[in-house]
Amino acid sequence: MAKSQKLEILLIEKDEITLELYQRELSKSFNVMAFTDLDGVLENLTRRDIRAVIIEPETCTGQGWDFINTIHKEFPDRSIPIIVCSTRDESSQNRGKHVSSYLTKPVLPKTLHEKTLEIVKS
């Protein structure tokens, strides 16, 4: 896939080392816009053709779950897959009704890459 044809995804992760590891791996297949907080994320969702959002809900003092709900309220006509990659196992607490996949850390970058490819291609 040529660089200009890479699909765009958002990666929101508060830990800069984890962010760099995930971004490096995901960049093999995607144009990754990486954020350590929520500043600028909605603007990118509005202006770009984002194909998936990968988020650590604990980003920005735990407001990640509210942000996931905001995505679905602000963009009801777009089906943007959300992949939660979290240190907390909250997958069974019904918080992820808008979540396409829930991964509990530690998650290898390759595993996240494969899951993202699977979801974006479906």
Predicted features, each with a name:
Residues 6-17, 22, 53, 71:
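Conserved acidic segment of CheY-like receiver
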Residues 15-34, 38-40:
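Two-component/phosphorelay signaling modules centered on CheY-like receiver
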Residues 34-52:
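Acidic, metal-coordinating helix/loop segments flanking the phosphotransfer/catalytic sites
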Residues 51-75:
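Conserved phosphotransfer microenvironments
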Residues 66, 87-105, 114:
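Alpha4 helix (beta4-alpha4-beta5 surface) of REC/receiver domains from two-component response regulators
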Residues 78-89:
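A short, hydrophobic beta-strand element within the central beta-sheet of small alpha/beta folds
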Residues 107-120:
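C-terminal output helix
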